From Swiss-Prot:
Keywords: Cell cycle, Cell division, Cytoplasm, Cytoskeleton. Residues 30-51, 199-235, 329-362, 434-458, 547-586, 721-772, 786-855 are annotated as: Disordered. Residues 208-227, 790-801 have a biased composition (Low complexity). The gene is MAP10. The lineage of its organism: Eukaryota, Metazoa, Chordata, Craniata, Vertebrata. Expressed in different cell lines (at protein level). This is Microtubule-associated protein 10.
Length: 905
């Protein structure tokens, strides 16, 4: 015990810079064989042909195992010669050993460091290496300075050039190398005390704890200063880290050489059977050489300066629990034993949650016996699992996330943690098939009653709300289907001002009125997004469905170039929801009506408030008698714009005085709007007198006259442009024909319409002189698309209603064109209108007379006025945001003076 306490740990670091050989003195194979029999402690791998030199340098310190240093290309590879006979190594080895300082001092004085240059002949198993040269390097000076009685320091280093001689004493070359001997003290011995016991069949070598402690040599990077030598860097021994050849060696007292080397976590061991010094047989030496061919020159950081053994990074989530090996045994020692038992037998791996290849990816480590490990691992597993569950229970959001993930991957939750009552609704799905059942059960088993009740309330509320949402969505879908037949579903447009569930619930409690407004806006946005897709591909079957639902027998529209108008028509008829309200009355009409009523209130409330003002505005801008409200649904883009009008109207300064009117007869309004829309469409397409006859008996609620008229749709410049363009087209074509000049142009305009629509929601109103009519016009060809944007909001008559243009002739042409269109409509339609319409008619008569010359002779001005006003108001009803003429227009002079400066009566 006293001897072991007095032992110290020493480090010997060796670096070979280069070797020079005299080519003429290279030994013959026969001579080499004789020399090797005497130098059997030198080892090494494959050799090349005599033409290629495959050298290796062997070092032997006292009776410790031999250290081999190879050229950079590794063992068996022909060494590169910068000039003939010179081989650059630049590599070295480092070893640790334990001895009593006095013993080491005494032995180093007597025994030098044996250095040999070997030639590795080719063949497998590797033949006996050939000795090319050898030299003895005295370590007496180092022993005096490090462990002698007058030791001057803990380390001594030396670099020099030493001559090589063969067995006959002839000089064969030179070797340049450096060495350093370091005293590491006794503090680190505790890390090397773990015994390594193994038996080798045939060799019969067994290493006992005592022998191991006495002759243990571990790897250490030569470039790393020892703890006691922090102030003395390596100096001349500048060994590149990448070139260090580190090999762990274990030697027994019985003169056995046990050489174990580690390469990338693989275990390979070599045991050289005991013999007296140089008396080992050649076969055991060859075996060592073969084994060490691939194992040397591998840099592995020694465990000396690490608290834990380094392990390869396991793949993520492969092993939940890893058992840390005790640090007493270096991993190289473990790897050195061939029969060593692995730490990860199946019994140990069974305690892992996910047994996998991770166990094989770690270098084997010698730890406690397997049964002890199993017990500890099982306890650790259970404890870790319990801790994890407890932690998750304190983090409800994380718990919810885990449950959601398990659902996504169809992995049932083995032991679901406590579910926070406020998050219980997360586990519910529409069909109630999700893990909410398990969640509920765990809640009840783990939560208090009050918590459960809270969770139940939350669940019920959220469920009810979700049900309502789903119902609304279904209604939307159903109405869309019924109105749009089998048309392709349009992808949702981007949400402008989204109404989240949280906001909806909060508003329901705090500000129901604002909730209504938000819902209307959302409806409006939905319609617009639907229109974007349906505008171009709505079959006429949609119109048929609508007409049948409205119980009015209107002629169906031809499918030629008015599909777009049909699409917009769907939107115009107060969107699919309103339509569904009309003919899905028993199931969904109540909810739809309510929503629609609120929407109509807001959208048409602006119409109503502006009702009085809008008539003036509409009539005055309209050079033609037709009020703005005569938005031709026949115009493809017009339908889209009717919606636009509603948001714009909100910005009007007109007083909201007729919101209540909206609610009076929502159902009536819906039917009327739909009928009017149908009538408009049929009028465009068929132009027959019977088009509007079924509408004639409809009741007109106040909203019909009240639809708002917003002036912000165009500037005077744009209006004049549209007038010119339209005028040019109208002169040569029938007014109706000009309205539908080309489907493509309508399409382009409608696209613009939609874009302008969104922007118009929050845009400030434009000049009062700019009529909505021009905005409603989509029938103008693409060449006039700029003007079309403004004109799209109203029918052809709306075109005429645009404010004055530079050329009055164009205005007159526009008026005449609109009047002629009105005339046609008058022939086709006979509608009951209120007395307010008649007064409007009278006030507009001067305009009619003005443009009467352009009307067909068979139509009277009165008819024109009649049809135009009725048409105008009917069309106004066909969409939420459509324009309307107010009843307050007393005289056309007012309109002309206020809205048409520069226009003389």
């Amino acid at each position: 015990m006293a001897a072991s306490l007095s032992e110290r740990l020493f480090s010997l670091e060796l670096l070979v810079d280069w070797v020079r050989l005299e080519a003429r003195l290279l030994p013959s194979p026969a001579a080499a064989v004789e020399q090797e029999e005497e130098e059997e402690e030198k080892e090494q791998g494959e050799a090349s042909s005599p033409r290629g030199l495959c050298p290796a340098v062997a070092f032997r310190l006292l009776d410790f195992p031999t250290l081999l240093v190879y050229p950079p290309d590794g063992p068996g590879a022909p060494a590169a010669e910068p000039w003939p006979g010179v081989i650059r190594f630049g590599r070295g080895k480092s070893c640790l050993f334990r001895l009593q300082p006095a013993t080491l001092h005494c032995r180093l004085l007597r025994t030098p460091l044996a250095t040999l240059l070997l030639q590795l002949p080719p063949g497998r198993p590797t033949p006996t290496p050939q000795l090319l040269g050898a030299c003895d390097i005295s370590l007496a000076t180092a022993a005096h300075r490090v462990v002698g009685p007058a030791a001057s320091g803990c380390s001594h280093r030396h670099r020099g050039r030493f001559p090589l001689h063969n067995r006959v004493g002839e000089r064969t070359g030179d070797i340049a190398l450096a060495y350093r001997l370091t005293d590491l003290g006794s503090r680190l011995l505790s890390q090397l005390e773990r015994p390594l016991t193994f038996t080798r069949t045939g060799g019969g070598a067994e290493v006992s704890p005592q022998t191991q402690q006495e002759r243990q040599q571990l790897q250490q990077p030569a470039s790393q200063p020892s703890p006691k030598e922090a102030d003395k860097p390596l100096g001349e021994l500048e060994i590149p880290e990448a070139q260090k050849d580190l090999k762990e060696m274990v030697k027994s007292k019985a003169e056995c050489d046990n050489v174990g080397s580690v390469e990338n976590g693989k275990t390979n061991s070599v045991v050289t059977c005991s013999g007296a010094g140089n008396g080992r047989n050649v076969s055991s030496l060859n075996e060592e050489v073969t084994e060490l061919d691939m194992e040397t020159n591998i840099f592995c950081p020694p465990p000396l300066y690490y608290t834990n053994l380094t392990q390869e990074k396991p793949p993520p989530a492969q092993a939940k629990i890893t058992i840390e090996p005790q640090m007493n045994a270096p991993e190289e020692m473990d790897d050195a034993s061939p029969e060593k038992k692995r730490v990860n037998p199946p019994a140990h791996r069974s305690c892992l949650k996910h047994p996998s290849s991770a166990a094989h990816e770690h270098p084997p480590m010698l730890v406690n016996p397997p049964h002890i490990q199993n017990i500890g691992a099982t306890n650790q597993t259970c404890q870790t699992e319990q801790n994890r569950i407890n932690t998750i229970r304190q983090l409800p959001l994380l718990n919810a996330l885990l449950v959601e993930l398990s659902l996504l991957y169809d992995q049932p939750v083995t032991s679901p943690a406590h579910i926070h009552p406020h998050l219980a609704w997360l586990y519910r799905t529409e069909d109630k098939k999700s893990p909410e059942s398990s969640a509920k059960s765990t809640c009840r088993s783990e939560a208090k009653k009050d918590k459960r009740s809270v969770g139940g309330c939350e669940k019920s509320v959220s469920l009810q709300y979700k049900k309502n949402q789903i119902e609304n969505y279904k209604e939307d879908k159903y109405s869309e289907k019924s109105s749009g037949a089998l048309h392709k579903r349009v992808p949702k447009g981007r949400l402008l001002y989204g109404l989240t569930n949280t906001l909806r619930l909060r508003l329901k409690l705090t500000n129901p009125d604002m909730l209504v407004v938000h819902e209307k806006r959302e409806l409006y946005r939905k319609r617009q997004s639907q229109m974007l897709g349906t505008k171009f591909r709505i079959p006429s079957s949609k119109v048929k469905l609508l007409s049948s639902a409205e119980q009015s027998q209107k002629p169906q529209l031809p499918e030629d170039k008015y599909l777009d108008s049909d699409a917009s028509f769907t939107e115009n008829s107060d969107t699919s929801r309103q339509i569904s309200g009309v003919f899905d009355e028993p199931s969904t009409s109540k909810e739809t009506k309510l929503k629609y009523a609120t929407e109509k209130k807001t959208v048409d409330c602006s119409k109503n408030r502006i009702n009085n003002v809008s008539l003036e505005e509409v009539v005055s801008p309209a050079n033609s008698i037709i009020p703005e409200r005569l938005t031709p649904t026949n115009i493809l883009g017009g339908n889209v714009e009717m919606k636009i009008q509603s948001p714009c109207v909100f910005q009007q300064d007109a007083v909201v005085d007729r919101i209540v009117d909206k609610e009076i007869d929502i159902r009536q309004v819906k039917t009327t709007d739909n009928d009017i829309l149908m009538a408009d469409i049929s009028d465009k397409r068929t132009g027959k007198n019977s088009c509007y006859e079924n509408i004639s008996e409809l009741k007109y609620s106040d909203d019909l006259s009240s639809p708002c008229y917003s002036e912000d749709f165009c500037t005077s410049e744009d209006t004049s442009r549209s007038f010119k363009a339209h005028d040019s087209s109208s002169r040569t074509e029938n007014p109706k024909h000009s309205q539908y000049t080309s489907k493509s142009s309508d399409t382009g305009v409608s696209k613009k319409k939609n874009s302008s629509d969104r922007s118009s929601i929050l845009s400030p109103p434009f000049s009062a002189g700019s009529p909505v009519h021009s905005y409603r016009k989509f029938h103008i060809s693409k060449t006039q698309d700029k003007s079309l944007e403004e004109a799209s909001s109203i029918s052809a008559s709306d075109l005429s209603s645009t404010h004055w243009t530079e050329q009055k002739e164009n205005q007159i042409d526009q008026n005449s064109m609109h009047n002629s269109e009105i005339t046609k409509r008058a022939q086709d339609i006979s509608v009951k209108t209120r007395s307010s319409w008649k007064s409007l008619e009278k006030s507009q008569s001067p305009q009619t007379s003005q443009v009467s010359s352009y009307l067909p002779s068979n139509v009277s001005e009165l008819n024109v006025l009649d049809s135009s006003t009725s048409d105008h108001f009917e069309e106004g009803n066909d969409d939420v945001g459509s324009l309307n003429i107010s009843k307050q227009c007393k005289d056309i002079c007012e309109l002309v003076i206020n809205k048409l400066p520069g226009y003389t009566m």
